[in-house]
């Protein structure tokens, strides 16, 4: 069982989308987070993992879509996203690591 005291258990993955790339230029980063985590836990986790200062955290719950399968209807899991805005003067986060070469 994972522990919410470990910051890497709260932040699951960065969101890779056109909108999230546009927000990165403004200092706002989007992450998939655990559904039972709150804004304070997300803020502490981002500050510990990336070594930055967070000014605000906005969260949104996305309901899973209902999809047709050959056996009837199925459902994708619901997710929670966190949009984290860094404080002014904070270094940008290198989410995707260094160069591939």
UniProtKB/Swiss-Prot annotation:
One of its GO terms (biological process) is translation. This is Large ribosomal subunit protein uL23. Part of the 50S ribosomal subunit. Contacts protein L29, and trigger factor when it is bound to the ribosome. The gene is rplW. Keywords: Ribonucleoprotein, Ribosomal protein, RNA-binding, rRNA-binding. One of the early assembly proteins it binds 23S rRNA. One of the proteins that surrounds the polypeptide exit tunnel on the outside of the ribosome. Forms the main docking site for trigger factor binding to the ribosome. The keyword Metal-binding does not apply. The lineage of its organism: Bacteria, Bacillati, Actinomycetota, Actinomycetes, Mycobacteriales. InterPro entries: Nucleotide-bd_a/b_plait_sf, Ribosomal_uL23-like, Ribosomal_uL23/eL15/eS24_sf. HAMAP family: Ribosomal_uL23_B.
């Amino acid at each position: 069982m994972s522990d919410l005291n470990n910051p890497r258990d709260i932040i699951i993955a960065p969101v890779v989308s056109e909108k999230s790339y546009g927000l990165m230029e403004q200092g706002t980063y989007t992450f998939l987070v655990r559904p039972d985590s709150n804004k304070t836990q997300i803020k502490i986790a981002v500050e510990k993992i990336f070594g930055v200062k967070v000014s605000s955290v906005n969260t949104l719950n996305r309901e899973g879509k209902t999809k047709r399968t050959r056996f009837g209807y199925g459902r994708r899991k619901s997710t929670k996203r966190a949009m984290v805005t860094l404080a002014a003067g904070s270094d940008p986060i290198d989410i995707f690591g260094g160069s591939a070469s």
